[in-house]
C-alpha cells in the first residue's frame, strides 16, 4: 500500500505491507485519516473499502466504521519529477548529527528567507573532503562537519528549508539505516528502503559565513562539554526572560543576569 502526501513544498511517499484484493487509487484528507487510525487500539486490523464509482472511502476496524469523502487521484498534486545530478548515501545517525547540531541556529525571520534553513555543502578542509552543515540567525552560528562523506562528485551548496529539517526525523528513526540523498537544481530527496521525502530547496544565496567566524583568537579554553552544559543550565535558572544571558566571569565561574 503506497501512501503519498504533500503540501507542495514537501512530498512524502511511504509504503506498507497490505493484502490487496483490488488495486486502485484515490485521494482522501490526510489529517482526518491520521486521527482515525491513531485512535484505534494497538494491533487493530484496518480494512479500506472503495466501491467502483463511489466517492467515499469506508474504513473498518474491529467494531468501528468510518466513511470519508474522496477525490479522484488525478486531483492530487504531485511534485514534478526531474533528474537528480548528485547522489550519495549516508548513515541515518550521521545525517541526524549534521542537522540536530545545527538546526538551533536557524532563523525564523521571513524577510531573511535565505537563513530559514541549514546550508549544506561539500568543501576541502586540511586536505580532507568534508560535508558541512551551517546555520545562522545573524546572532549565532553553528557549523558541523563530517569527514570523507563518500561523495563521488561535488555539488553547489544548497539550503535545506527549516520545515524539511523538522520533518526529517520520520525517515531517520533507525540509526543504522542507509539514507540515499539526491540533489537537483531545486530539490533534495532523502530515501530509505520504504520512505521517500522530497523537498524544494530555498531559492536564495547563503551569506559568506566564514567572514564572521573569528580567527587568530588569543584566548582559548577547552572544557568538558557535558559539564559546561550542566553549569550553564544551572545558572540560567536565575537569568531574566528577556536577555537569558550567561556571562563567564573567570575560568571557574559563570554568572547569569
Segments the model singles out, each with a brief description of its role:
Residues 1-255:
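Structural preference for solvent-exposed beta-strand-turn elements
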Amino acid at each position: 500500500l503506497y501512501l503519498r502526501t504533500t503540501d507542495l513544498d514537501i512530498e512524502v511517499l511511504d509504503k506498507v505491507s497490505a493484502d490487496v484484493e483490488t488495486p486502485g487509487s484515490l485521494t482522501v484528507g490526510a489529517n482526518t485519516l491520521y486521527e482515525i487510525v491513531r485512535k484505534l487500539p494497538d494491533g487493530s486490523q484496518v480494512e479500506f473499502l472503495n466501491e467502483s464509482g463511489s466517492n467515499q472511502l469506508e474504513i473498518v476496524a474491529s467494531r468501528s466504521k468510518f466513511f470519508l469523502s474522496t477525490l479522484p487521484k488525478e486531483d492530487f498534486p504531485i511534485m514534478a519529477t526531474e533528474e537528480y545530478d548528485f547522489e550519495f548515501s549516508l548513515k541515518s545517525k550521521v545525517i541526524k548529527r549534521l542537522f540536530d547540531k545545527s538546526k538551533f541556529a536557524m532563523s525564523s525571520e521571513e524577510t531573511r528567507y535565505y537563513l530559514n534553513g541549514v546550508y549544506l555543502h561539500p568543501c576541502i578542509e586540511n586536505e580532507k573532503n568534508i560535508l558541512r552543515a551551517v546555520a545562522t540567525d545573524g546572532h549565532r552560528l553553528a557549523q558541523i562537519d563530517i569527514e570523507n562523506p563518500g561523495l563521488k562528485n561535488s555539488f553547489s551548496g544548497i539550503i535545506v528549508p527549516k520545515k524539511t529539517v523538522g520533518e526529517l526525523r520520520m525517515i531517520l528513526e533507525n540509526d543504522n539505516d542507509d539514507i540515499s540523498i539526491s540533489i537537483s537544481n531545486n530539490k533534495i530527496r532523502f530515501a530509505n528502503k520504504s520512505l521517500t521525502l522530497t523537498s524544494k530547496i530555498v531559492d536564495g544565496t547563503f551569506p559568506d559565513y566564514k567572514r564572521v567566524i573569528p580567527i587568530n583568537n588569543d584566548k582559548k579554553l577547552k572544557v568538558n562539554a557535558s559539564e559546561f552544559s550542566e553549569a550553564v543550565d544551572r545558572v540560567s535558572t536565575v537569568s531574566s526572560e528577556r536577555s537569558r544571558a550567561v556571562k563567564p566571569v573567570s575560568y571557574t565561574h559563570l554568572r547569569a543576569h
